[in-house]
Amino acid sequence: MAKQKIRIRLKAYEHRILDQSADKIVETAKRTGATISGPIPLPTERTVYTVLSSPHKFKKAREQFEMRTHKRLIDIVNPTPKTVDSLMKLDLPSGVDIEIKL
């Protein structure tokens, strides 16, 4: 495999789980002899929902809820076949969304 790059994007609502998953991926890739760039923290997406706190009246009384989506980016440069196999077998928590591009 000459000059290939695997780009892994991780998304999660909790940053602790996200960082643990990124550390697992980096450790696995380093153990197999690949060169790694990252984890790079990307901007956090913040979605705010405003709802009325009373069912009928009192329009001024409102509550705001927010969801934060944390993101990380990991680049694996010159991956070996062993790296790809070990990444496929890696078990990550269910709260982490993974996108892999070759």
Swiss-Prot record:
What PROSITE patterns would the database entry show?
Answer: RIBOSOMAL_S10
Question: Which InterPro entries would you find in this protein's record?
Answer: Ribosomal_uS10 (IPR001848), Ribosomal_uS10_CS (IPR018268), Ribosomal_uS10_dom (IPR027486), Ribosomal_uS10_dom_sf (IPR036838)
- The residues forming the signal peptide are none
Looking at the Swiss-Prot or TrEMBL record, what is one Pfam family this protein matches? Ribosomal_S10
Q: Membrane-spanning regions, if any?
A: none
Q: Which GO terms describe its cellular component?
A: ribonucleoprotein complex; ribosome
Which GO terms of the molecular function aspect are on file?
structural constituent of ribosome; tRNA binding
Q: Keywords in alphabetical order, please.
A: Ribonucleoprotein, Ribosomal protein
- Taken from the UniProt record, the cysteine pairs bridged by disulfide bonds within this chain are none
Q: Is Ribosomal protein one of the keywords?
A: yes
GO biological process terms, semicolon-separated: translation
Q: What does this protein do?
A: Involved in the binding of tRNA to the ribosomes.
Q: What protein family is recorded?
A: Belongs to the universal ribosomal protein uS10 family.
**Subunit structure, as described in the record:** Part of the 30S ribosomal subunit.
This one is known as Small ribosomal subunit protein uS10
- What organism does the UniProt record list as the source? Pediococcus pentosaceus (strain ATCC 25745 / CCUG 21536 / LMG 10740 / 183-1w)
Lineage, top ranks = Bacteria, Bacillati, Bacillota, Bacilli, Lactobacillales
